Amino acid sequence: RERAGCAKGWIPFDGRCYGFFPQELSWRRAEGFCQRLGARTHLASIHSEEEHQAIVSMLASSQPYSDSEEEAGEEVWIGLHRPLGRRNWEWSDGTKLDYGSWYRDVFLRRRACVALEDTTDFATWDVELCSDRKPFICEYRT
């Protein structure tokens, strides 16, 4: 059965649905995976403290984070990235960057993709190598 218009296993928040995927992919492959799930599905974009909290709560209740200490310790991809040759961050779904919760927002040439930082219980964002393989969150609008 669908929850608030979301597919089974997805979490609803404010007209969007979020799904956590534990398989580890590069940022680009994760975005491609999300897009293949359906029209208008992308890596998650975050536009408010409330939306961020909803995602953090979902991660807290997702495997493998809740079961064993040594499993915890991975950042989780979201849809923020800096396209090649650009200086500005962009969401993969094309929405505007109007909220931030940076652990560090630094211009590191080789680090152009953003993940939720596990050491702060996913409360902050950090810049990572896009080729790093991490679990990820997909999102679609209902």
UniProtKB/Swiss-Prot annotation:
Would the keyword Secreted turn up in this protein's UniProt record? yes
For the modification Phosphoserine, the affected residues are 62, 66, 68
Q: List the disulfide bonds.
A: 6-17, 34-138, 113-130
An annotated GO cellular component of this protein is:
extracellular region
Note the Pfam families from the entry.
Answer: Lectin_C
Domain named C-type lectin: residues: 13-139
Example GO molecular function term?
A: carbohydrate binding
Q: Which InterPro entries match?
A: C-type_lectin-like, C-type_lectin-like/link_sf, C-type_lectin/snaclec_domain, CTDL_fold
Keywords for this entry? Disulfide bond, Extracellular matrix, Lectin, Phosphoprotein, Secreted
This chain's protein is named Struthiocalcin-2
Q: Where does the record say this protein resides?
A: Secreted, Extracellular space, Extracellular matrix
